[in-house]
């Protein structure tokens, strides 16, 4: 097993060293979401490890290229409000697994998969302060296949964002020039709010069309009753 920090191929501009979370990010659960991607061997020769090693080296190189556009992913969560990036890079682990892809996929079982593909990524603190936004572990299977395990913070990386990142990484690994590029403008569109203050209750008058009158009256009553309690 080996561990390294993969840095963006180009240094991050000084003005981008801190990324402020948006209101939408604040509302997301502070949890890391795991994902496993399986890749079958190119050929049936399980001893062709030179080719596997070449692919792994290309994965690291292309990840470095991809992080140039996705620079917040290589940072750490600070105070639950910011992503601090200081060129430390993203945690990247390589491990060997003594099982084949067919053994894992023949009878899919999450517990078995977790045992055969142990995660050596850092333990996550409940507060997520100082925790890497994203961590990656690449497992070399004995058949020549590869299993890539990712753990990404749901505060900044939701499903569509994760898909965009993986597409960009794959495009870079293929040497394709059509890699998607993010813009990270959410903090401008949805500025942060102080969520520690209690929500103020206001009477809300609902006017519904296409519904029976008793439903509209009931909802108006519940709204006024809620605002008075």
Per-segment meaning from a language model:
Residues 1-229:
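Non-catalytic N-terminal regions of enzymes
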